[in-house]
């Protein structure tokens, strides 16, 4: 049985254009992208949704989330965080490997796949983690099974540090899968922490976090990753740039295989916000200066940075108590990433077509994701309807994440997510998940 649904009279934003039109979907796929007011297909639809006044965007692909499942489900799980994603217009997520057990073996990956198949309401894919000992697993893994290999070149939540130079060289030389790096120099960080503790006590105030996890620590590690990628011709995507200086290392014209991501915390906050928000904005790498934030925004707008992600990393608030040493790093962000970035469009930081490039098109290209990320006939019907000029203020009762807090609480947004369609199914509708038991699909990769 084929169900034909026509989304009519929306402003469609896709592949560098914005135009008034309609979208015809048949079951799980896009059938036609139609231009003009009241555009209709030759074949009559079974249902018409009037989207007048809304923008119709491809579903967001968030390539950097930590849904904490398995093993850390007291703070988040696949069901709760995928609900948050759907409520935010995110239809596909790539989940990171620092869970319990770490996703560094075939058995651990199979467990995670089974959990997601049962509990994830949006589409999902995974990165597997590199360690100093699992080279054989990474050599034989099916390239169409996972998005990339995550390499922690700096220690962070989960303690998956890869610090043997010969292991790093082998990883970059392998070239079977893209590599995504967390780049911070652990030696510099440990030295800075001890120096800060000597003056400020065992748990320095959170405002020292940016000095401890410093710009120099980021630059030194990112420089090594980029140098290895150039040497071995590796497909490298550097996660969560946080400094202006790191931007000097990227030249897409000369090295198109080496790309960069920026995450919401480093676009929305600066070190001036530590006094107000404290450990709620403590993350790794640290939130740094206004100059760094503004440089990252400019690089995102002009194309030097390829993708926006969230680094969605929920913790319970009690785990966020303390200072730079004791409070855990990470914050929930997936539910409000799209409306947060649309706010930057309103501020003139970047255009709406450029935003869609960074949150939808480029994530699909960089990770070889099949049939998602674009509004094209034959592609999966993953899309979101958002309404501008519809202000609302973020309060805890709106939060879907299990941890039930956000560093953005109290902020007023001018855009509202009205409907999220995932594989042609209306999953989120004006404030409500429509089906608690909906199951997303595993991402496939064109390799």
Predicted segments with their positions:
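N-terminal metal-binding scaffold of metallo-dependent hydrolase/deaminase domains
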Residues: 1-42
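Divalent metal-coordination and catalytic microenvironments
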Residues: 10, 23, 28, 53, ...
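Active-site metal-binding motif and surrounding structural segment of the metallo-beta-lactamase
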Residues: 39-56
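Metal-associated gating/positioning segment near the N- to mid-region
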Residues: 52-119
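Histidine-centered catalytic micro-motifs
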Residues: 59-70, 180-184, 241, 310
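Histidine/acidic residue-rich metal-binding segments in metalloenzymes
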Residues: 136-308
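His/Asp/Glu-enriched, well-ordered alpha-helical/loop segment
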Residues: 203-224, 228-233, 301-308, 313-389
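C-terminal cap of metal-dependent C-N hydrolases
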Residues: 323, 377-444
């Amino acid at each position: 049985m084929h169900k034909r649904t026509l989304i009519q009279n929306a402003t469609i934003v896709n592949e560098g254009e914005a135009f008034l039109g309609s979208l015809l979907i048949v079951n799980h796929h896009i059938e036609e992208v139609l231009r003009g007011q009241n555009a209709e297909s030759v074949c009559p639809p079974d249902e018409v949704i009037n989207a007048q006044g809304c923008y119709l965007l491809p579903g967001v692909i968030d390539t950097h989330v930590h849904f904490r499942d398995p093993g850390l489900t007291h703070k988040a799980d696949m069901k709760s965080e995928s609900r948050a994603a759907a409520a935010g217009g995110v239809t596909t997520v790539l989940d990171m490997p620092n869970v319990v057990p770490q996703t560094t073996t075939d058995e651990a990956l199979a467990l995670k796949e089974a959990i997601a198949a049962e509990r994830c309401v949006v589409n999902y894919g995974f990165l597997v983690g590199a360690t100093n000992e699992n080279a054989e697993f990474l050599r034989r893994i099916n390239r169409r099974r996972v998005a990339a290999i995550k390499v922690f070149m700096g220690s962070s939540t989960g303690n998956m540090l890869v610090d043997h130079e010969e292991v790093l060289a082998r990883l970059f030389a392998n070239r079977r899968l893209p590599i995504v790096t967390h780049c911070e120099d652990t030696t510099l960080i440990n030295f800075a922490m001890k120096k800060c503790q000597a003056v400020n006590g065992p748990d320095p105030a959170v405002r020292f976090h940016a000095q401890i996890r410093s710009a120099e620590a980021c630059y030194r590690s990112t420089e090594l990753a980029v140098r290895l990628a150039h040497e071995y011709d590796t497909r490298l995507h550097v996660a969560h740039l946080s400094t202006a200086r790191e931007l000097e290392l990227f030249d897409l014209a000369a090295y198109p295989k080496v790309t960069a991501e920026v995450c919401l915390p480093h676009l929305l906050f600066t070190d001036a916000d530590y006094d107000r928000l404290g450990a709620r904005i403590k993350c790794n790498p640290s939130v740094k200066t206004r100059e760094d934030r503004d440089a990252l925004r400019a690089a995102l707008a002009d194309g030097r940075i390829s993708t926006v992600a969230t680094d969605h990393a929920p913790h319970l608030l009690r785990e966020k108590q303390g200072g730079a040493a004791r409070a855990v790093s990470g914050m929930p962000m997936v539910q409000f990433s799209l409306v947060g970035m649309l706010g930057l469009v309103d501020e003139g930081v970047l255009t709406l077509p450029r935003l869609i490039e960074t949150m939808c098109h480029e994530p699909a290209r960089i990770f070889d994701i099949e049939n998602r990320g674009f509004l094209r006939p034959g592609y999966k019907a993953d899309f979101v309807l958002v309404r501008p000029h519809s202000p609302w203020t973020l309060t805890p009762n709106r939060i879907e994440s299990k941890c039930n807090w956000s560093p953005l609480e109290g902020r007023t947004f001018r855009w509202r997510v009205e409907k999220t369609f995932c594989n042609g199914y209306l999953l989120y509708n004006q404030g409500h998940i429509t089906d608690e038991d909906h199951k997303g699909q595993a991402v496939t990769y064109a390799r």
